From Swiss-Prot:
Molecular function GO labels: DNA binding; excinuclease ABC activity
NCBIfam families: PRK00558.1-5, uvrC
Residue ranges the record marks as coiled coil: none
Name of the featured protein: UvrABC system protein C
Subcellular location: Cytoplasm
Amino acid sequence: MTDSFNATQFLKTVSSSAGVYRMYDAQGVVIYVGKAKDLKKRLSSYFRRNLPNVKTQALVSHIANIDVTLTPSETDALILENDYIKQYMPRYNVLLRDDKSYPYIFLSGHRHPRLAYHRGPQREKGHYFGPYPNGGAVRESLHLMQKLFPIRQCDDLYYKARSRPCLQYQIARCSAPCVGKISDEDYAEQVKLASLFLRGKDQQVIATLVGKMEQAAMDLNYEDAARYRDQISALRRVAEQQEVSSDSGDMDVIGAYYASGIACFHLLFIRNGKIFGSRSYYPSVPDETEVSEVLRAFMLQFYLNVDSQRTLPREIVVSHEFEDIHELEEAIAQASNRRLLIKTKVRSERASFLRIADANAKNAVETRLSHQNTVEERFLLLEEALEQSQAINRMECFDISHTMGESTVASCVVFNREGPSKGEYRRYNISGITPGDDYAAMKQAIGRRFDKIEADGKIPDILFIDGGMGQLRIAQKVVNEKFAHLDVAPTLIGVAKGEGRKPGLETLIYGENEVAFSLPADSGALHLIQHIRDESHRFAITGHRNKRQKTRNTSTLESIPGVGPKRRKALLQYLGGLQQVKGASVAQLSKVPGISLEMAQTIHDALRG
């Protein structure tokens, strides 16, 4: 693990509940996602002296942070783990785990829809139900549904080739829509029932099966009764994806926790009765503010936001009451044209979800407090190492990133006594300089940062420059000019890479007197400097790569006659990037909205010419 991560302190905050954990490296990238029945026991196993294999050792050596999400059951954790893996694509999951996606049941968008087993990208039009825990559960379900609903399960080529009913019709497993043995209306009704069943509306189906089982038993037909019993068990196993019952529907559940000046709202997004995902939010809370007041302000901003309206549930469950709940309901309804209920007093499954959300919020606050204590200790050590008479409350760090002078970007990251203040990070697109001139880039970036320092008022106590003496001198000169008329100015410190760029061997240089010094490799003060330096590097290189890719995409397509901004955007979005556009055939290009066959030929010839 990295020097900035205190495993002992972290494990004190971890619950023994089931859940999912995400491991991050020093650049803030998710490198591993896992699930556990007992999070504390599982995460503790990573920090034993004798790790089981080289891959685990490699993973642990890169851990800089861990986030956890509690879940009601291990099955929930399994599904959520898969969602996160698909979202983040962590490199150690690819190395250590079978990354096959979970299976789905697919209902096609055909005139006579078919039911099918599906695993992989969801490209075909239709409805996808799942994900399910394993392929066997899906196949059992399809086999059961074939008996409950006479919907075809053959592929479209087989369907189109039929001139008479197949064997499935003879054994009452299909209604033979291919040859008109059922009307379109009756078939559509069967499809509707099957769709309801797949959405969890299965109580009527179960009741029907129970009735058939009891009737078979009364008729002394024990073989059929046993078959119905097995079908009911299979149906319940498939529906077991979530412990919540099917009437929970779509809702957001908001747990809240507030302690030592930190508030956290943890949202569980419940869709179709299962946990679709979760997220924690940390609002800035003025002193002496009630949790209910902060909750109201958070909900107002979150649910009236345009992005949030696209996936609004019909119900929101919250842990605290506040005065104008009904007014907020009306405001959301007006903004989204959708009726929404906010509930505070809940029982049964909703109460269970609320307990999970509250537990996640509490766990998040305790983890952040633990992290803050570590950061605070390192700030004190840094003040001592730099012999600062005043407290260090704000630090900034600049870095420059480019590729052979192309698409130069400067970053400015901010740390306070709580750690990274990501909302204050800034990037500067550098222009008007000789490509590859890092000194000129640094001069421009710092000049722009402090151009309006009097109006801004946010003066860093320490300003770190990722670079050697040359960059530091340029930065010091700019700071002297910008702060000449002020009574205060930041202390500049250059962070020069050590021999072989090995962490712990950095040379630190005071800007004013150019005195070089170093700190012990195990110094908490040095770890804090490394953290802000690495963060500025990550932020700069991410911005540079995005700018470089955008520039290359635009410049390549700009030269093609008739391809303006709208068509460039359509090509890149539809096909997924410049390389995909270059590799596309004329037929594929012509499928892009706004691209005719003639224009597709022009683009194809230009890119291949």
